């Protein structure tokens, strides 16, 4: 009781915190004891999470590096195993493949040219020049590939060439479309006289060539093509001129043959007869 009286003049018991020697400091986040423990726990948890994240990142980085190393190793092994594939073994094979590529390109270009002419994207004059050149190149290509390409239709099938217009122009007919249908619009007297003289000269030159036995395909074919073109320039003949049909048939026949082939005696005699008959009809038409 004396103890109580020494600390409390009113004889009341001392408060429960009177025996605390060093009270905890207050904190704006809450009660002192709870706050400190929570803060410490949070700090510990954060440290643990950070350590876990760092460990995960390190593991991911290590996995990525291992994966990259594995890919690089496989790539190096793959490059080491690659072998050069040659399309040809010698110069002869190389030339053959180049000639095949040229034939392929000629057919494709002719197909595009025919479609452009149908759409009126190219003038008749330019079409005739380009088409005649392609036909000549086609004949030369056939000569170079006579042992490899015996059938152009089969060649187009093997290489998936769906070029019907080119096949008709190069293989079946062998002359530009402008030679089938007259596209020349010149009608003056001077131009008419020039066209007549040119046609007469070509008739005579072609017939003389046959009489001299110069009957190889690469020799007769250009003469007949020039004659056909010259007759088309003479509009006054009309589309039913008999001589034009006969010459067109002969051009188609020659187009089926190789450039190095020659007409036999029967073919030469028949061609000469048809030309002579066509020339006589043409000459009579001039006088009439």
UniProtKB/Swiss-Prot annotation:
One of its GO terms (cellular component) is late endosome membrane. Residues 1-65 are annotated as: Disordered. The keyword NADP does not apply. It is found in: Cytoplasm; Endosome; Late endosome membrane. Residues 18-64 have a biased composition (Low complexity). Residues 191-287 form the VPS28 C-terminal domain. One of its GO terms (molecular function) is protein-containing complex binding. The keyword Nucleotidyltransferase does not apply. Residues 1-10 have a biased composition (Polar residues). GO terms for biological process: protein targeting; protein transport to vacuole involved in ubiquitin-dependent protein catabolic process via the multivesicular body sorting pathway. Coiled coil: none annotated. Keywords: Cytoplasm, Endosome, Membrane, Protein transport, Transport. It comes from the Eukaryota. SUPFAM superfamilies: Endosomal sorting complex assembly domain (SSF140111), VPS28 C-terminal domain-like (SSF140427). It is a peripheral membrane protein. Pfam families: VPS28. Residues 74-181 form the VPS28 N-terminal domain. Belongs to the VPS28 family. Component of the ESCRT-I complex (endosomal sorting complex required for transport I). This is Vacuolar protein sorting-associated protein 28. It comes from Dictyostelium discoideum (Social amoeba).
């Amino acid at each position: 009781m004396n103890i109580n009286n020494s600390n409390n003049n009113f004889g009341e018991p001392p408060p429960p915190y009177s025996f605390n020697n060093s009270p905890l400091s207050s904190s704006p986040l809450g009660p002192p004891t709870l706050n400190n423990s929570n803060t410490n726990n949070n700090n510990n948890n954060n440290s643990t999470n950070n350590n876990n994240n760092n460990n995960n990142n390190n593991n991911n980085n290590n996995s990525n590096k291992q994966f990259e190393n594995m890919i690089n190793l496989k790539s190096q092994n793959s490059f080491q195993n690659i072998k050069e594939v040659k399309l040809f073994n010698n110069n002869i094979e190389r030339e053959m493949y180049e000639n095949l590529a040229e034939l392929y390109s000629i057919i494709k270009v002719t197909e595009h040219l025919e479609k452009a002419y149908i759409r009126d994207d190219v003038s008749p004059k330019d079409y005739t020049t380009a088409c005649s050149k392609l036909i000549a190149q086609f004949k030369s290509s056939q000569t170079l590939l006579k042992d490899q390409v015996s059938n152009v239709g089969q060649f187009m099938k093997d290489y998936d060439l769906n070029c019907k217009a080119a096949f008709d122009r190069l293989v079946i007919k062998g002359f530009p479309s402008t030679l089938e249908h007259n596209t020349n619009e010149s009608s003056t007297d001077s131009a008419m006289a020039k066209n007549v003289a040119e046609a007469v000269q070509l008739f005579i030159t072609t017939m003389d060539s046959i009489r001299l036995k110069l009957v190889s395909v690469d020799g007769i074919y250009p003469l007949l093509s020039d004659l056909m073109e010259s007759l088309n320039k003479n509009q006054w003949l009309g589309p039913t001129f008999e001589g034009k049909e006969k010459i067109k048939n002969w051009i188609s026949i020659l187009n089926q043959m190789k450039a190095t082939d020659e007409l036999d005696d029967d073919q030469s005699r028949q061609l000469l007869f048809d030309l002579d008959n066509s020339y006589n009809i043409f000459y009579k038409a001039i006088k009439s």
